[in-house]
Each structure stands twice: as structure tokens, then as C-alpha cells.
């Protein structure tokens, strides 16, 4: 078995995690740092990767997340929100694929995702692009907020995965009632 131990600071916040699996000790999370409002602003994992988080001072929403390994940037996400805090977009501006010494598998890369919502704040449209792949997704809802359709199209050089789902309910006047 494995025993995971949470270590806390004086404020009761997790500051590190360790593991003991079959007698072998390891560090899962070496350090977690917080700001005065209790937001996580820094994490260092057991593998040495470090992440910093920046928040909007007025609305306390995550604005930016930066991930580094061996001092080199791996990911730099920037987040956008609407007036009611729905996330409108995530952009990663770092392309770590050129860093062959720390990214032998050539994972990650620049990406851009956008989201749209209806007047009830339900996700109705999403688009994104990363590497050589892109996707679109659209959803519709009924009067009781039940999903009616979901159409997703994925296009990449390696594969294309598309689907079109139509949801049907036995009792249209009570679509969310148990049957």
C-alpha cells in the first residue's frame, strides 16, 4: 500500500505532500505558497517543476499560470473572463517543444481555447487549437436546461474525431424527472 501524508502550515493550509510506498519515501509536493487572501501562488513538485499563479486583485480570478522545469518555461497560460466570471479563453504562449533536454517527448506547445455562454451561463460554444489540431464544440439546451444536442468536430493531421449527440427524454414536460 501507499501512505500519503499531508503537511500543513500554521494557517491550516497544505504546504507539502509526501508518500511512503512499500517503504520508499518520496516527495509529491515539495512546497506550496499562498498570498494573504489564501490563493495558491507557488507550487514546487517533487520532480522539481515549479508553478507560479497570478490573480486579478479586484475579482480574485486566476490571470496567469507559469510552469517551469529546470528554470525553463514549459507553460504560460493566460486566462480571460466575462463580467460574471465565466472563462472566455485560455492562451498558452510557450512552445516547450524546442527544449529537447527537458522535454524529450515534445509535449505541450502553444495553444488557444475560446468559450461562449448563453444568457443562463451555460457553455454553448468552444473552439481551440493546439499544435496541428483544432476543435469546435456546440451545445443546445431545452427549457429545463437539459442538454438537447452536442456537436463536436476535431481536426488534426493524425486523426479526425467528430460526433453529433442528440438527447431524448421520455417525458418532454418533465425532462429531468426520474423514471
Regions found by a protein language model. Give the residues of each.
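Acidic/glycine-rich beta-solenoid
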Residues: 1-179
Amino acid at each position: 500500500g501507499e501512505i500519503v501524508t499531508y503537511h500543513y502550515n500554521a494557517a491550516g493550509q497544505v504546504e507539502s505532500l509526501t508518500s511512503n510506498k512499500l517503504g520508499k519515501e518520496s516527495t509529491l509536493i515539495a512546497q506550496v505558497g499562498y498570498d494573504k487572501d489564501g490563493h495558491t501562488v507557488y507550487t514546487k513538485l517533487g520532480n522539481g517543476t515549479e508553478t507560479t499563479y497570478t490573480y486579478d486583485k479586484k475579482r480574485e480570478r486566476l490571470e496567469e499560470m507559469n510552469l517551469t522545469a529546470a528554470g525553463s518555461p514549459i507553460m504560460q497560460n493566460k486566462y480571460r473572463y466575462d463580467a460574471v466570471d465565466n472563462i472566455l479563453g485560455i492562451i498558452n504562449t510557450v512552445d516547450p517543444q524546442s527544449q529537447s533536454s527537458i522535454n524529450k517527448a515534445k509535449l505541450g506547445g502553444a495553444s488557444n481555447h475560446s468559450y461562449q455562454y448563453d444568457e443562463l451561463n451555460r457553455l454553448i460554444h468552444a473552439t481551440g487549437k493546439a499544435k496541428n489540431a483544432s476543435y469546435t464544440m456546440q451545445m443546445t439546451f431545452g427549457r429545463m436546461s437539459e442538454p438537447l444536442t452536442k456537436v463536436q468536430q476535431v481536426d488534426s493531421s493524425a486523426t479526425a474525431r467528430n460526433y453529433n449527440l442528440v438527447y431524448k427524454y421520455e417525458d418532454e414536460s418533465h425532462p429531468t424527472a426520474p423514471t
